[in-house]
Amino acid sequence: MKTLLLTLVVVTIVCLDLGDSLICYQAYNTPQTCAPGENLCYTKTWCDYWCHVKGKRIDLGCAATCPTAKPGEDVTCCSRDKCNPHPLQRPR
């Protein structure tokens, strides 16, 4: 009986996802827990028509794979909690 119980406990532990979910910034100073399978944080920046007035557009979030940069975009990815802060949050 003890062997059966021990086996059930081991199977339960192996089947459960005991790892922590990744936390990424989704907007300025707004961290959010990523969905299962999304193991990367990304920062995407690009210029639009108003870039000369407002600066670059910034998109932050979680991803399963690093987004591919289109022409004119810069994309960076990382895999630690809160590793993609908004550029205005970064220490100077």
Curated annotation (Swiss-Prot):
Superkingdom is Eukaryota
Q: Which Gene3D superfamilies match?
A: CD59 (2.10.60.10)
Q: What is the lineage of its organism?
A: Eukaryota, Metazoa, Chordata, Craniata, Vertebrata
Q: What is its main location?
A: secreted
Which Cys-Cys disulphide bridges does the record give?
C24-C41, C34-C62, C47-C51, C66-C77, C78-C83
Q: Which Pfam families match?
A: Toxin_cobra-type (PF21947)
What is the protein name given in its UniProt record?
A: Long neurotoxin 73
The UniProt family comment states:
Belongs to the three-finger toxin family. Long-chain subfamily. Type II alpha-neurotoxin sub-subfamily.
This chain's function reads: Binds with high affinity to muscular (alpha-1/CHRNA1) and neuronal (alpha-7/CHRNA7) nicotinic acetylcholine receptor (nAChR) and inhibits acetylcholine from binding to the receptor, thereby impairing neuromuscular and neuronal transmission.
| GO MF annotation: an example | acetylcholine receptor inhibitor activity
Offer a single GO CC term for the protein: extracellular region
Compartments where located = Secreted
Keywords attached to this Swiss-Prot or TrEMBL record, sorted alphabetically, are:
Acetylcholine receptor inhibiting toxin, Disulfide bond, Ion channel impairing toxin, Neurotoxin, Postsynaptic neurotoxin, Secreted, Signal, Toxin
Cross-referenced InterPro entries? Snake_3FTx, Snake_toxin-like_sf, Snake_toxin_con_site, Toxin_cobra-type
Among its keywords, does the record have Ribonucleoprotein?
no
Query: Which CDD domains does the UniProt entry name for this protein?
Result: TFP_snake_toxin (cd00206)
Tissues where the protein occurs: Expressed by the venom gland.
* Annotated signal sequence range: 1-21
